[in-house]
Design a protein with these regions (language model features):
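Acidic (Asp/Glu-rich) sequence patches and key acidic residues
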Residues: 1-138
Length: 138
């Protein structure tokens, strides 16, 4: 799980193939800089998965990965200030959606501090005019 930043002029929308959904993303890996990483935080990943599905007008969930679309391995979701407001409210309230998966581990109360640190970094990046994306490989 990771968040990247890039210059808005380096954003493209790509169709990743028949088994993947189109996604907005940095034009190349050289155009992006790592902003934040997480490990074994399935609840946060579920929150970003739900955000991606809403933004793309899709239905499904991560638990339906074998039956329908999944948010994994190449899709990116662009994060706005409004998204960060919603995420911050969910983190502060302990209201991230619960999720579990093979090798995912579990989210812990200690993740809250790290999530809030990410939100602060993402807000700074947006204020600098950068684009912020979330993605993951699982």
């Amino acid at each position: 799980m990771f968040a990247l930043t890039c210059d808005p002029s380096k954003v493209t929308r790509q169709d990743l193939g028949v088994d993947q959904m189109p996604t907005e993303m940095p034009a190349s890996t050289g155009d992006a800089k790592m902003l934040h990483t997480w490990r074994k935080h399935p609840d946060l990943h579920q929150w970003f998965t739900d955000l991606y599905f809403r933004k793309e007008g899709l239905t499904g969930s991560i638990t339906q990965a074998e039956m329908g679309p999944a948010f994994n391995a190449g899709q990116f979701v662009r994060i706005t200030e409004h998204d960060l407001d919603q995420l911050e409210a969910a983190v502060e309230a302990g209201a991230l959606p619960k999720a579990a998966g093979f090798f995912w581990g579990v989210s812990t109360p200690e993740d809250k501090k790290d999530d809030l640190a990410f939100i602060r970094k993402a807000r700074k990046a947006l204020k600098k005019g950068l684009v912020v994306f979330y993605s993951s490989w699982w």
